[in-house]
Design a protein with these regions (language model features):
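N-terminal hydrophobic/helix-forming segments and targeting peptides
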Residues: 1-170
């Protein structure tokens, strides 16, 4: 989304302010015969925070949990390190591939299932908070009287290489 806002004067140089609206997540790549969902990351996700996280899957926002091999099935070497994304899966409670496919499809998006929280002395946390704050700032600027005209861009694909902002800059 690109918005041009006329200000009180035209600047010497064109100005564009950009914020991104996308967020990191996952995409379903495979469904096992037991109904577990294999996935890959979308965007720069710190793999150390994935295991055990609650997620929502697909258009129906099916609840799931990211897991892996049970602790009693791991070797002592495996217990000493974090499992790789390739060794993790999403459990949506399906007991078969057929049951899983009745709710989700290959290529479905997966999102972290977390909520806004206030903590400490005036701190907040939420998924994709940088995106949401950026959008709010641009919306407030658009709705204000500006000294100079400016272009505002609400872009996507920042999480996979700032592609949206790069295209909008032209």
């Amino acid at each position: 989304l690109i918005v041009y806002k006329k200000g009180k004067a035209e600047p010497k140089n064109k100005v564009m302010l950009d914020t991104h609206m996308d967020e990191v997540g996952f995409i379903i790549t495979y469904i096992t015969e037991d109904g577990y969902l294999k996935f890959t990351t979308v965007g720069g996700i710190d793999e150390r925070v994935i295991f055990g996280r609650a997620v929502k899957v697909g258009k129906e926002l099916i609840p799931g949990v990211i897991g892996g091999k049970a602790i009693h099935q791991t070797t002592s070497e495996e217990r000493g390190k974090l499992p790789s994304v390739e060794d993790m899966y999403i459990d949506i409670g399906a007991s078969s591939k057929k049951e899983a496919l009745s709710h989700v499809s290959l290529g479905d998006a997966v999102y972290f299932d977390s909520c806004y929280r206030e903590f400490g002395d005036g701190f907040i946390k939420a998924k994709a908070i940088d995106d949401r704050v950026g959008c709010e700032i641009l919306l407030r600027l658009i709705n204000s009287d500006l000294p100079y005209s400016a272009t505002f861009c609400f872009s996507v694909q920042e999480e996979i290489g700032t592609r949206g902002a790069a295209a909008a800059a032209y």
